[in-house]
């Protein structure tokens, strides 16, 4: 694409993985502007063609979401030396780090719940557009210095109106993947993403990698330090049987909204009445926050 010829590679961000893609950081000549270039190799092969097309289509659909990486262009190129056809996706540069590299123990409860809410915002928009991410994990969640969340890597997403038999490979299976995805990646539904969200929340609030799905409920029973209202929500998210999980992300939001109100909506003013003597008594015993006034 001619508009990106004035950009030079300044760093290699990742080598080829299971999606056969490389990621580079580009800088515009004589400028402080940066973008990211993702090159998917071997797109003559149906699998990698599907990966390229899916990610490109998904990102264009979701391009207005604040919490999903933005696409700024795409191209088909041919390698000069090998003649290999490659697909290229140009993305916004996110000045941040993967959630997996964040010092979890240094995050406050408010910051953790903010990350969760932004993640839900991103996946809600994705699901509303018929897109299942299929690979939600801490390495695909970027966090900026200002704690803004950006979900990345839609390379193995499932688009409901795009069924392709070429993707009969097992992709994206890790400790954050739902058990049905481990059996076959095309088994993924919205509930599979919800399982992954639950696994991410578990990691965020414990600092530990999630256990196997078959052990998750027992592990959750012995978890310490997690908010008493959050625990049953996570348990439902990571149920081994998809039928036992939340029906959709809207149902999840309904349950978790009270926690968001407690930890995030702290600037709201609440007015209530009580006898003044009772009020003084509660304040004396420190049963009301000092911010509560007459």
Which sequence ranges carry the predicted segments?
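Short beta-strand micro-motifs within the conserved protein kinase catalytic domain, predominantly
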Residues: 70-87
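AlphaC helix of the eukaryotic protein kinase fold
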Residues: 44-61
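Activation segment signature within eukaryotic-like protein kinase domains
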Residues: 115-116
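Conserved short submotifs of the Hanks-type protein kinase catalytic core
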Residues: 82-98
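Catalytic-loop of the protein kinase fold
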Residues: 127-143
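Regulatory extensions appended to serine/threonine kinase catalytic cores
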Residues: 264-294
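Conserved activation segment of eukaryotic-like protein kinases, specifically the C-terminal portion
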Residues: 167-181
């Amino acid at each position: 694409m001619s508009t990106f010829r004035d950009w030079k590679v300044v760093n290699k961000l990742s080598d080829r993985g299971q999606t056969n893609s490389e990621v580079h950081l580009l800088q515009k000549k004589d400028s402080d502007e940066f973008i990211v270039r993702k090159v998917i190799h071997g797109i003559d092969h149906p699998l990698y063609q599907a990966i390229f097309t899916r990610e490109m289509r998904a990102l264009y659909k979701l391009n207005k979401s604040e919490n999903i990486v933005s696409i700024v262009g795409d191209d088909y190129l041919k390698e000069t030396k090998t003649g290999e056809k490659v697909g290229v996706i140009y993305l916004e540069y996110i000045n941040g780090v993967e959630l997996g590299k964040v010092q979890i123990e240094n995050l406050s409860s408010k910051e953790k719940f903010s990350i969760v809410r932004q993640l839900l915002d991103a996946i809600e928009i994705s699901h509303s557009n018929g897109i299942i991410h299929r690979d939600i994990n801490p390495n695909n969640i970027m966090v900026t210095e200002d704690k803004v969340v950006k979900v990345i890597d839609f390379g193995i997403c499932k688009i409901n109106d795009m069924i392709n038999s070429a993707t009969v490979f097992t992709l994206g299976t890790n400790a954050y993947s739902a058990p049905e995805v481990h059996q076959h990646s095309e088994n993924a539904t919205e509930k599979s993403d919800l399982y992954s969200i639950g696994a991410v929340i578990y990691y965020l609030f414990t600092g530990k990698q999630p256990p196997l799905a078959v052990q998750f409920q027992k592990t959750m029973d012995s978890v310490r330090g997690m908010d008493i209202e959050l625990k049953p929500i996570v348990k439902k998210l990571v149920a081994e049987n998809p039928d036992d999980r939340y029906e959709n992300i809207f149902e999840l939001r309904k349950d978790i909204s009270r926690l968001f109100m407690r930890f995030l909506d702290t600037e709201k003013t609440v007015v209530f009445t009580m006898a003044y003597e009772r009020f003084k008594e509660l304040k004396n015993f420190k049963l009301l926050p000092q911010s509560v006034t007459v």
